[in-house]
Amino acid sequence: MGRFISISFGLLVVFLSLSGTEAAFCCPSGWSAYDQNCYKVFTEEMNWADAEKFCTEQKKGSHLVSLHSREEEKFVVNLISENLEYPATWIGLGNMWKDCRMEWSDRGNVKYKALAEESYCLIMITHEKVWKSMTCNFIAPVVCKF
């Protein structure tokens, strides 16, 4: 009986020590992980509204990419550079409700912006590392995030 308690206690200690560590975050095949989110670059080119709809159809909770820090933006720029030659991709920032207020398509707070100017739909120009306003009917590749 004493040995059983000793083994049980040992397993409990191992479990508790491992539960305090953060497990590796895994994304589905073809998606890349960064800071508890998954990202995927798609080569299909479409307008902003179709791009947002496309992203929502890829995975539950997926939207056009939202960027909340310079570090996250660097990660996405590198991901795009590895997958596309095209220098511009849609991001999920736009004047969603036409009320002169910028908002991420995933409804996240706008904490970080690298805007060249404000307009209705934005693309990220990867080689310049800036965001630029563009007509929402412009055709560009897509980066989705969930």
UniProtKB/Swiss-Prot annotation:
It is found in: Secreted. SUPFAM superfamilies: C-type lectin-like (SSF56436). Disulfide bonds join 27-38, 55-144, 121-136. InterPro entries: C-type_lectin-like, C-type_lectin-like/link_sf, C-type_lectin/snaclec_domain, C-type_lectin_CS, CTDL_fold. One of its GO terms (cellular component) is extracellular region. PROSITE patterns: C_TYPE_LECTIN_1, C_TYPE_LECTIN_2. GO terms for molecular function: toxin activity. It comes from the Eukaryota. Residues 34-145 form the C-type lectin domain. Residues 1-23 form the signal peptide. Keywords: Disulfide bond, Hemostasis impairing toxin, Secreted, Signal, Toxin. PANTHER family: MANNOSE, PHOSPHOLIPASE, LECTIN RECEPTOR RELATED. Belongs to the snaclec family. Heterodimer; disulfide-linked. Interferes with one step of hemostasis (modulation of platelet aggregation, or coagulation cascade, for example). This is Snaclec 4.
